[in-house]
Amino acid sequence: MTPEVFMLCVFAALLVLDTTYAFQLTFSRGIIAAPLMSLITGDVMAGIQIGVFTELIFADVSPLGGILPPSAVVCSAVSLALNAMGIDLYFAFFFGVTGSILFSVAEKFMRKNRFKWLVFWERKILQKPNTVNRTVALALATSFLMNFILIFIFTWLCGKLMLTLLPYIPMKAHFACKFAYMAVPWIGLATLVPAFRLKAR
């Protein structure tokens, strides 16, 4: 695990806060987050590519009701981190997609359990109103720490696994993953066609 990958995980954990917990300035969108994170690894073109692919692959997932969409930040972070560790982008991206889906499941669980903490913090603020800033900062720090732990552990495990298996992966598997990776934008665009058709009517 290089310092660049570690810093990437830290930055990703901060960007995840932009989705719901703080600011909401759309920095957590894949098309923005991936190029920003790629500045850490030094491969901006890979960041732009991952950002576009992430936007397209999750284009038809809408955060409505109880649906929590996969995290574009996690997808981008895992993909770029694994690529920085020497894993081909066409392998890294699919680990990123898997990580983003698992992260959304974990986040849904954390949000359910966070309600108890919110009640506790609300009572604390009502008792001591002057502690509101400290309480909010503590809540954000807790969310950041949980995000970092989840992203770091998943990236580390995937990196170890792929670096171990990479010499034994046959060329046919490389070709299949390359083909699947290059099909991602077309699949994403295909999911948008019905949406545009409905808007046009």
Which stretches of residues belong to each language-model region?
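Hydrophobic alpha-helical segments at protein termini of multi-pass membrane proteins
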Residues: 4-11, 76, 82, 113-126
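Small-residue-rich segments of transmembrane alpha-helices in multi-pass membrane proteins
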Residues: 32-41, 76-86, 126-132
